[in-house]
Amino acid sequence: GRLAVVPIGYWSARFAEGARCTIFTERGSYRGTILPLMASGHTYGDDVDEQPTGWPYVEIRVDARCSTAEEAIRLGIDVGDVVSIDPQPEFLDNGFISSRHLDDKAGVAVMFAALKALIAVKDQLPVDAYFLFTIEEEVGIGAANILTEDIASLIAVDNGTTAPGQNSAEFGVTLAMADHNGPFDYHLTRKLARLCREDDIYYQKDIFRHYRSDVASAVVAGHDVRTALVCFGIDASHGWERIHIHALRSLAELVTAYLLSPIAFWRDAEEVGTLEDFTSQPTEKAEQKLSSDVRMDEIPDEAVEE
């Protein structure tokens, strides 16, 4: 009568243990709990702590009369029924939000906040903008099949990862410079950084080595678009996640500022362009006060590069 489960996308079974859930069947929904195979200390003793972690070692206890496979079938439970996990959100007075599924429901909230701000200011956007909400990013499809030919730039709103070795933060905007598939568009990302500075939006940059965003799936699918990834920092992503409202507000401000900003790449409107006005990276040398004949005790602070 217990149900085996498999994840959709990547999610560690470590964070599934103890989760309350809903099983959706063709005859209606049932409630249940995801438990390790050995869940009772009174029955299994120390073996409870010594059992492995992984999806083969957890099961769903259905809150119904369901002690055998036959009883589960009579309830209408079948192979392939979808299971949803309770998010159990908590909003703290100090601005922190703890919950499951902040990746990427928090991104949806950011986009709706930007939409609300655009409606409030009633300014005409310099170019058409589409707000796209994907539901298949976790399985690698993402934005592969939702872009039209007239889209020139694609900015994904997703989570950054606050962890040792990363530069993301739960405050301000995190601008992703690259993910698992490679770097994002230099000029589009540079424009986003400039907007942050002009509008006093706190930001930092980061690179994600084990991360694949919607923009990656769009490029792999063959869409000729500039790409960027803007993030809110999440602690313990895909686990018991936590963010701060400061990051969400900052990100909504950046999205709004970007949509209201002048078009930077008019040549992108042409299907095929010339080398005239082709975007290029700066090649001039950075100015330094350090010279080859300076003594060590005379090294100026401006010459120290961070």
Indicate residue ranges for each PLM-predicted region.
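N-terminal hydrophobic/helix-forming segments and targeting peptides
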Residues: 1-306
